[in-house]
Swiss-Prot record:
This is Cystic fibrosis transmembrane conductance regulator. It catalyses: ATP + H2O + closed Cl(-) channel = ADP + phosphate + open Cl(-) channel; chloride(in) = chloride(out); hydrogencarbonate(in) = hydrogencarbonate(out); ATP + H2O = ADP + phosphate + H(+). It comes from Colobus guereza (Mantled guereza). It is found in: Apical cell membrane; Early endosome membrane; Cell membrane; Recycling endosome membrane. Residues 1471-1481 have a biased composition (Acidic residues). The modification Phosphoserine is found at residues 549, 660, 670, 686, 700, 712, 737, 753, 768, 790, 795, 813, 1445, 1457. The keyword Transport applies. Residues 654-831 are annotated as: Disordered R region. CDD domains: ABC_6TM_CFTR_D1, ABC_6TM_CFTR_D2, ABCC_CFTR1, ABCC_CFTR2. Residues 81-365, 859-1155 form the ABC transmembrane type-1 domain. NCBIfam families: CFTR_protein (TIGR01271). The chain crosses the membrane at residues 78-98, 123-146, 196-216, 223-243, 299-319, 340-358, 859-879, 919-939, 991-1011, 1014-1034, 1096-1116, 1131-1151.
């Protein structure tokens, strides 16, 4: 960055903002880069400002019981704030004084007042000087207030971030990530520009008092008629505002419904294409869009009337002020024009400035109070450690994730006794409440010596992660003692990668030791991966490690933990995403050898790890099931496998929770409308019955992270339906929560509410920060694996990959959740995250405007209609002028003359008409014509938005994956959220305002030019200068705005990155380092924003200077060339003053239109995306064995079997090469093999070898070359839809969209209920669906959050059964499944797909039992294609990965003679499907 010219600028340069000229010149000539931006002054640095505010806030906390953040802000910024406020007031006062001089100038033209004529020139000079003074006062004042607002935002940004790093885990579990981002975007952005309006709260009353005093002098009591009208108008506008809010509230819910489906569609676009659901999704979204647009139109009409009221009110204000006085006393011409000028100022003050100021204070104080509440939340308490301690000891430790259960229970009991329910069954309310306080860990005792390895095992939800959290101090024990040295290193279950190089991620701020670093790299099997990168370990990783595979991320996280020299290493399931061979090597070389002298606690479920551990701790439901050595375990607990793996009583355990959850659900549906709660009760945070099905449940929209939620919490109650939460006066639909994209931080979205098309759980869910930290960003390999060159993160948002226990054991916060969300409005939709795909020109091209206008032919006619009406208005004014100009003047003797006023001219009847006709024609107040001009325009522009949304949706759904792979999913989603919101809301009204203002200015100039032709000569250069200055400024300002957007992205990215890795940060003590990084991101953004504000003020000041010059010219031309016509001078000067304010407003509107049209450019860019090859490249009548084959995919149950293709499922793959993008590197090369009909093939290979990619290539989701045939039919011979319908798919990332069970299973509605129930029976879903209200019509939301991951897999299985596909593709179906669901899937595969070809991609050896052939993929090519027996020869790498116990499972008969009977480990053998009885999930 360059040094800022501001540092050496003179006072004059600072006053006129001349120091910005170098950047404006450079931006006009070339494209600006980040290096061109100036450094910020030290007074604006985040370090200085945060320290200043933090010091005052600490002082406030120390001195008062009820600390107020506003007091701390006052002590920091008050005096500067008031200084600029006084400047602003003085500038506004000049506007009130100008009409006085105008009146004197007009009076000087009175033929009977000759002595005044001589001083007219001096009065003109005085009037021009007032304009100059106003310019010199207002612009520095406004800039100063913007600057203070920026500093306040920076200081509070930093304070919030620092507080976030200190929050306790309990508090983090009650705050959504969306709310925190909302803090830093919507709430704090109010300070940036809103502060300039704040002073009008006191300026406007003073100004109104001054103006009314001056008008009283002219018109006496009549003055209050105009003021009364303005007050009525302001109240009318307030009423319209309330009506508009009502429509916006209703519309917000509809927008959310559309966005939830749209985002699910984008996040799972590969699944949509694999299932051939493009048409179904498009129809679904368009139906929601229709309903939304009806409300959009209503809101737009109300906003139109609100905006029009200001324009059309000018005439009435003057008319009502002047008419009573004129009727009673008669009126002089001077008073009319002076009143007009006063009323222009009065109208702006009362109807615009004062309401805006009140709204600013309301918003700002609300934001400050929310931030204040946040800053007082409970902080993470650092435990006291003894550094001399060598062992790790826990004595009688019990812990809860929640506090104060006794008090909560009493509140609930009291509240429930006051509540009258319709069914009278109060006992249901407490059915599980007594179990709410079940501890997550109970009576834990163990001791491990230095250098020992403790393996912690247990089923999902047993409390394994919670145990590690307690050792780290994240979970405070309610009883017992914990003792260790405090020097901890931690590896999370879900690998966390910060933006930076691989080396920086591993070293993580610890001093660099080359020898140690190399040994860690080698032990974690990273040498081979690093060698593939050109920059080796200096390659820069994106946020979340987007360019790495899940296994690579896991190994880097482990390497970071191992590199740190600590006494105690906590490893939470670090091998979850590694293939068997890699896992085995790392466990041996890293955990057992490299760390041999260190104390290690390893969470694992692998038998091999338990055998090598010094001690084993098995947890079950939060209690110790076993503690000891492996040999003791075999002797004392022969049934331990069931507790370890979750087999024993799993189904009963789940069923118990399932029954209670469904009982509560049904009960809440019956109570939902019967138990209203008073406002008083909600404010007291009383218990209430809501429709919230686990408020803290994951929201796939809010938390776009490839995640699996395995946070170990055991609660006896499935979901606390009766939790305490803060109520809000706002409707649910108005809640907004913004969240960045999981791994790149580029999307910001409104809070998604639920679809209300059937029986559903009306919920407002939020993704807690604690959830965010316990979720994975590397859930195995996505079907579309990332390459380093690619910029798209394929899986934007996951579905809830949750185990059944986790779903049913999720707790609801007992403490009030922090509510800092906002309603959806234009500001909320501002992009928090920059789209780096955006390559839109700095200024919107004329081609974009032309294309936008021609989208809908009606728009052209409407614009012509607007022009015709405008010409009619101007023509009417000119005709009146001509007519009155030719009317002979009235005889002076007929007029009444007041001797009391030395220079008063009494207007006759004719001349009074003259004045009012001119004013009517010029001020654009032909109400009927104005009304008919604007409303059709707004209506048509919304229709254009509807058409563009439809075209963009169709284009995205039909785009090939090779194109979509080059885009960020968050960027696509921003087009449907932010840009469509701009097209719907902002653009129509902004275009209307601009056209309205432009026509007013042109009309006024036309009338002035007719009255005084010399003025037209002065107008031409002013217009030319305005156009040139606007073009000059826009070129730079749009680039600065773009750079500001880019600078904003790292702030939010860093926040989310910090939250994801917060436990790691704390364990490593890296909070100060991350605070420094955050301040650097803030300073970068500040540099861009400050320069944008400065250049904007430069432009505004230059525009005003041009207008001042124009007004000076008009004034002196009028004074020097006008003879005796005081009316003419009055009209010219009044209009010139009006043009001054209106033209500047029009200039700003034109800049806004240009900025908003960039959204249109982005939408057109998506509309122009290429489409998939829909038609076959060969004949659509393929031949098989020389005979014509009738190609038919089963789409309903009534087709004849003879017409069906495929019939057998034979596949032949020849020279298949696959790429993600057109010019990308091949992911698979020259793959050739064949599969016999009905054969089962397993895909084997290391993480990232291309297994999932091969399945995608089968579906033609990638850029492919070569040929694939199914039953002799080539993929070139059929359409894409026909080809993909030949496959049934169970993807790695399960896709459940928001809609009914029926829609999710059969989106095209091809099957009857009987057929759907039959399939549900086959896959074990019937008992689940039947217990929900509405059964098949029950609406699933949030990616099916009420279903476990197993249920979702079964849903995918049911879809495949319904599709009657002959080839089934399974991508790691057993990942994260509980054993029971896994057995059901195995059984269904045997029964429903007995005669189908099955291709299975799996890491687990036991999952491969049914496969006859195995395809080994290595280095993008087929290494081997054979049976497992041949793969397990001595030369095979895979033999090393298969343990003897696995071989027993794979070949039980072959090995039975060699294996002695070992009854004590009989439980280790996999349960056969016969042992798993008819399991009801």
């Amino acid at each position: 960055m360059q040094r800022s010219p501001l540092e050496k600028a003179s006072v004059v340069s600072k006053l006129f903002f001349s120091w910005t000229r170098p950047i404006l010149r450079k931006g006009y000539r070339q494209r600006l880069e980040s290096s061109d931006i100036y450094q910020i002054p030290s007074a604006d640095s985040a370090d200085y400002l945060s320290e200043k505010l933090e010091r005052e806030w600490d002082r406030e906390l120390a001195s008062k019981k009820n600390p107020k953040l506003i007091n701390a802000l006052r002590r920091c910024f008050f005096w500067r704030f008031m200084f600029y406020g006084i400047l602003l007031y003085l500038g506004e006062v000049t506007k009130a004084v100008q009409p006085l001089l105008l009146g004197r100038i007009i009076a000087s033209y009175d033929p009977d007042n000759k002595e005044e004529r001589s001083i007219a020139i001096y009065l003109g000079i005085g009037l021009c000087l007032l304009f100059i003074v106003r310019t010199l006062l207002l612009h520095p004042a406004i800039f100063g207030l913007h600057h203070i607002g920026m500093q306040m935002r920076i200081a509070m940004f930093s304070l919030i971030y620092k507080k976030t790093l200190k929050l306790s885990s309990r508090v983090l579990d009650k705050i959504s990530i969306g709310q925190l981002v909302s803090f830093l975007s919507n709430n704090l952005n109010k300070f940036d520009e809103g502060l300039a309006l704040a002073h009008f709260v006191w300026i406007v009353p003073l100004q109104v008092a001054l103006l009314m005093g001056l008008i009283w002098e002219l018109l006496q009591a009549s003055a209050f008629c105009g003021l009364g009208f303005l007050i009525v108008l302001a109240l009318f506008q307030a009423g319209l505002g309330r009506m508009m809010m009502k429509y916006r509230d209703q519309r917000a819910g509809k927008i959310n419904e559309r966005l939830v489906i749209t985002s699910e569609m984008i996040e799972n676009i590969q699944s949509v294409k694999a299932y051939c659901w493009e048409e179904a999704m498009e129809k679904m979204i368009e139906n929601l869009r229709q309903t939304e647009l009806k409300l959009t139109r209503k809101a737009a009409y109300v906003r139109y009337f609100n905006s029009s009221a200001f324009f059309f009110s000018g005439f009435f204000v003057v008319f009502l002020s002047v008419l009573p006085y004129a009727l009673i006393k008669g009126i002089v011409l001077r008073k009319i024009f002076t009143t007009i000028s006063f009323c222009i100022v009065l109208r702006m003050a009362v109807t615009r400035q004062f309401p805006w100021a009140v709204q600013t204070w309301y918003d700002s104080l609300g934001a400050i109070n929310k931030i204040q509440d946040f800053l007082q939340k409970q902080e993470y308490k650092t435990l006291e450690y003894n550094l001399t301690t060598t062992e790790v000891v826990m004595e009688n430790v019990t812990a809860f994730w929640e506090e104060g259960f006794g008090e909560l229970f009493e509140k609930a009991k009291q509240n429930n006794s006051n509540r009258k329910t319709s069914n009278g069954d109060d006992s249901l309310f407490f059915s599980n409440f007594s179990l709410l306080g079940t501890p997550v860990l109970k009576d834990i005792n163990f001791k491990i010596e230095r250098g020992q390895l403790l393996a912690v095992a247990g089923s999902t939800g047993a409390g394994k992660t919670s145990l590690l959290m307690m050792i780290m101090g994240e979970l405070e024990p309610s009883e017992g003692k914990i003792k260790h040295s405090g020097r901890i290193s931690f590896c999370s279950q879900f690998s966390w990668i910060m933006p930076g190089t691989i080396k920086e991620n591993i070293i993580f701020g610890v001093s660099y030791d080359e020898c140690r670093y190399r040994s860690v790299i080698k032990a974690c099997q990273l040498e081979e991966d690093i060698s593939k990168f050109a920059e080796k370990d200096n390659i820069v990783l994106g946020e979340g490690g987007i360019t790495l595979s899940g296994g690579q991320r896991a190994r880097i996280s482990l390497a970071r933990a191992v590199y740190k020299d600590a006494d105690l290493y906590l490893l939470d399931s670090p091998f979850g995403y590694l293939d068997v061979l890699t896992e085995k090597e790392i466990f041996e070389s890293c955990v057992c050898k490299l760390m041999a002298n260190k104390t290690r606690i390893l969470v694992t479920s692998k038998m091999e790890h338990l055998k090598k551990a010094d001690k084993i701790l098995i947890l079950h439901e939060g209690s110790i099931y076993f503690y000891g050595t492996f040999s003791e375990l075999q002797n004392l607990r022969p049934d331990f496998s069931s507790k370890l793996m979750g087999y024993d009583s799993f189904d009963q355990f789940s069923a118990e929770r399932r029954n209670s959850i469904l009982t509560e659900t049904l009960r809440r549906f019956s109570l939902e409308g019967d138990a209203p709660i008073s406002r008083t009760e909600t404010k007291k945070q009383s218990f209430k019955q809501t429709g919230e099905f686990g408020e803290k449940r994951k929201n796939s929209i809010l938390n776009p992270i490839n995640s699996i939620r395995k946070f170990s919490i055991v609660q006896k109650t499935p979901l606390q339906m009766n939790g305490i939460e803060e109520d809000s006066d706002e409707p649910l639909e108005r809640r907004l929560s913004l969240v960045p994209d999981s791994e790149q931080g580029e999307v910001i979205l409104p809070r998604i509410s639920v679809i209300s098309t059937g029986p559903t759980l009306q919920a407002r869910r939020r993704q807690s920060v604690l959830n965010l930290m316990t979720q994975s960003v590397n859930q195995g390999q996505s079907i579309h694996r990332k390459t380093a060159a690619s910029t798209r993160k394929v899986s934007l948002a996951p579905q809830a990959n949750l185990t059944e226990l986790d779903i049913y054991s999720r707790r609801l916060s007992q403490e009030t959740g922090l509510e800092i969300s906002e309603e959806i409005n234009e500001e909320d939709l501002k992009e928090c995250f920059f789209d780096d795909m955006e390559s839109i020109p700095a200024v919107t091209t004329w081609n974009t405007y032309l294309r936008y206008i021609t989208v809908h032919k009606s728009l052209i006619f409407v614009l012509i209609w607007c022009l015709v009406i405008f010409l009619a208005e101007v023509a009417a004014s000119l005709v009146v002028l001509w007519f009155l100009g030719n009317t002979p003047p009235q005889d002076k003797g007929n007029s009444t003359y007041s001797r009391n006023n030395s220079y008063a001219v009494i207007i006759t009847r004719t001349s009074s008409y003259y004045v009012f006709y001119i004013y009517v024609g010029v001020a654009d107040t032909l109400l009927a014509m104005g009304f008919f001009r604007g409303l059709p325009l707004v209506h048509t522009l919304i229709t254009v938005s509807k058409i563009l949304h439809h075209k963009m949706l169709h284009s995205v759904l039909q785009a090939p994956m090779s194109t979509l792979n080059t885009l960020k999913a968050g960027g696509i989603l921003n087009r449907f959220s932010k840009d469509i919101a701009i097209l719907d809301d902002l653009l129509p009204l902004t275009i209307f305002d601009f056209i309205q203002l432009l026509l007013i200015v042109i009309g006024a100039i036309a009338v002035v030019a007719v009255l005084q032709p010399y003025i037209f000569v002065a107008t031409v250069p002013v217009i030319v200068a305005f156009i040139m200055l606007r073009a000059y400024f826009l070129q730079t300002s749009q680039q600065l705005k773009q750079l500001e957007s880019e600078g904003r992205s790292p702030i939010f990215t860093h926040l989310v990155t910090s939250l994801k890795g917060l436990w790691t940060l704390r364990a490593f003590g890296r909070q100060p380092y991350f605070e420094t990084l955050f301040h650097k991101a803030l300073n970068l953004h500040t540099a861009n924003w400050f320069l944008y504000l400065s250049t904007l003020r430069w432009f505004q000041m230059r525009i005003e200077m041009i207008f001042v010059i124009f007004f000076i010219a008009v004034t002196f031309i009028s004074i020097l060339t006008t003879g005796e016509g005081e009316g003419t001078v009055g009209i010219i000067l009044t209009l010139a003053m009006n043009i001054m304010s209106t033209l500047q407003w029009a200039v700003n509107s034109s800049i806004d239109v240009d900025s908003l049209m960039r959204s249109v450019s982005r939408v057109f860019k998506f509309i122009d995306m290429p489409t998939e090859e829909g038609k076959p490249t060969r004949s659509t009548k393929p031949y098989k064995n020389g005979q014509l084959l009738k190609v038919m995919i089963i789409e309903n149950s009534h087709v004849k079997k003879d017409d069906i293709w495929p019939s057998g499922g034979q596949m032949t793959i020849k020279d298949l090469t696959a790429k993600y993008t057109e010019g990308g590197n091949p992911i698979l090369e020259n793959i050739s093999f064949s599969i016999s009909p009905g054969q089962r093939v397993g895909l084997l290979g290391r993480t990232g070898s291309g297994k999932s990619t091969l399945l995608s290539a089968f579906l033609r989701l990638l850029n492919t070359k070569g040929e694939i045939q199914i039953d002799g039919v080539s993929w070139d011979s059929v359409t894409l839809q026909q080809w993909r319908k030949a496959f049934g798919v169970i993807p790695q990332k399960v896709f459940i969209f928001s809609g009914t069970f029926r829609k999710n299973l059969d989106p095209y509605e091809q099957w009857s209920d009987q057929e759907i129930w039959k399939v549900a029976d086959e896959v074990g879903l019937r008992s689940v669906i039947e217990q929900f209200p509405g059964k098949l019509d029950f609406v699933l939301v949030d990616g099916g959050c009420v279903l476990s991951h197993g249920h979702k897999q079964l849903m995918c299985l049911a879809r495949s059964v319904l599709s009657k596909a002959k080839i089934l593709l399974l991508d790691e179906p057993s990942a994260h499944l509980d054993p029971v669901t896994y057995q059901i899937i195995r059984r269904t595969l045997k029964q429903a797909f007995a005669d189908c070809t099955v291709i299975l991609c799996e890491h687990r050896i036991e999952a491969m039992l049914e496969c006859q052939q195995f395809l080994v993929i290595e280095e993008n090519k087929v290494r081997q294609y054979d049976s497992i027996q041949k793969l397990l020869n001595e030369r095979s790498l895979f033999r090393q990965a298969i343990s003897p116990s696995d071989r027993v499972k794979l070949f039980p008969h072959r090995n039975s003679s060699k294996c002695k009977s070992q009854p004590q480990i009989a439980a280790l053998k996999e349960e056969t499907e016969e042992e798993v009885q008819d399991t009801r999930l």
